[in-house]
């Protein structure tokens, strides 16, 4: 009798099992830095406010194309994905309720000549796909901006559909 294929086993894993296999522990919801809430649920959609990149609990500052390269920006976007999932879990109680990551919007603090915002944002998109499987495939926008609050290098917001 043949063993299930790796692709089948991957589909059979729960979101929490995937997080555990990746060594990811989701953080608590960060306290907003201004007059807004971390998330809003409207019907079966959850809108998660922009999360900035953090390192060691402090804003991960820098500008892509000046003092940060694409690979480092991608790491920052991946770190944001972990924070976004922590907020999403707080919003719905269990990530198994997520039926689809609908949209990701990324703002990349970058110099005028930096053109790899899409590659930076892949740090978030790739992790969401790894954790949620097919449900993690999403629409996306990635923008280069002159500055982000607190000097952060990347800010990302997310919309998810939940059961």
Can you annotate each of these PLM segments?
Residues 1-12:
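Short, Lys/Arg-enriched N-terminal segments with co-localized hydrophobic residues
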